[in-house]
């Protein structure tokens, strides 16, 4: 999925996860099912469960962070106190990809 050094990815919200029993530091967190997308906006086969405090909805494209960046986004006062590995850090309003540049990347 994400390669070493890659802390952000784009994804489409495809659902949510409800959990009544979880560790205390996850109380009041909402969880979404994200399908990562590539630059051509095609969905990949993996899904990622992410924490969300921004209120993203099903069908929206979101920017997600991994690791420390995700924990910092969810609990900036003390990011080491929350046991998450991925989080929504932005909801995409629009995404413009230059087709010429995209073709260079693909080739």
Q: What is the predicted function of each stretch?
A:
Residues 2-3, 10-14, 19, 52, ...:
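OB-fold and OB-like single-stranded nucleic-acid-recognition modules
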Residues 71-107:
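C-terminal structural segments of small proteins and small subunits
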Residues 2-44:
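N-terminal first-folded block
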Residues 67-68:
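Short, surface-exposed secondary-structure boundary micro-motifs
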Residues 45-51, 73:
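Short alpha-helix capping/helix-loop boundary micro-motifs
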Residues 23, 51-55:
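Short, surface-exposed secondary-structure edge patches
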């Amino acid at each position: 999925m994400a390669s070493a050094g890659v802390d952000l990815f784009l994804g489409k919200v495809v659902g949510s996860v409800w959990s009544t029993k979880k560790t205390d530091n996850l109380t009041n967190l909402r969880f979404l099912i994200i399908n990562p997308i590539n630059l051509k906006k095609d969905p990949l086969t993996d899904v990622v469960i992410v924490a969300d405090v921004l209120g993203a909805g099903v069908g929206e494209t979101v920017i997600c962070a991994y690791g420390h960046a995700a924990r910092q986004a969810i609990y900036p006062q003390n990011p080491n106190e929350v046991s998450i590995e991925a989080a929504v850090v932005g909801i995409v309003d629009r995404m413009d990809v230059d087709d010429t540049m995209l073709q260079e990347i693909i080739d």
